[in-house]
Amino acid sequence: MKQTKIFKITLSGLLLALGIVLPFLTGMQLGSVLCPMHIPILLCGIICGWQYGLLIGIICPLLRSVIVGMPPIYPTAISMSVELGIYGFVSGLLFEKLKNKNLNLLLVCFISLISAQLLGRLGWGLVRFIMGLIDKTNVFTFSAFLSGAFIVAWPGILAQLIIIPILIIS
């Protein structure tokens, strides 16, 4: 199916709505473990392109914060906007560049996803660290970064690496 601009805008809107609604299924505690808002953003980048993935990634946590009150705008929604913006950008850009290189589509998915996850989490950690420097009451340590980015979130990372390639390949 030839993807038109209207299709990409429509699908991006649908994925944005999904990013706002999916966290209701997990609740707050399980949401930080399963990262349900991340899946629609990664899909948006891969399917619609890096421009849409970047935009929807930035908008989704901020819009959800305004509409629902969760995540809190500061520091969580702001740092998540950077993280998810990077997710959408990197997943879309790498998928676009690698899919025509005679590589297995599954391999392209994994390279795009893992790169986006690593860079997005680094962006999240950097923003949280800078916020901690500015706001001395919100200090963000390296152990807090490792815990929040990888240790607590590993089930969500694994779920993304399983669910997204299945959806892309099917």
Model-derived segments and their meaning:
Residues M1-S170:
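Loop-helix junctions at membrane interfaces
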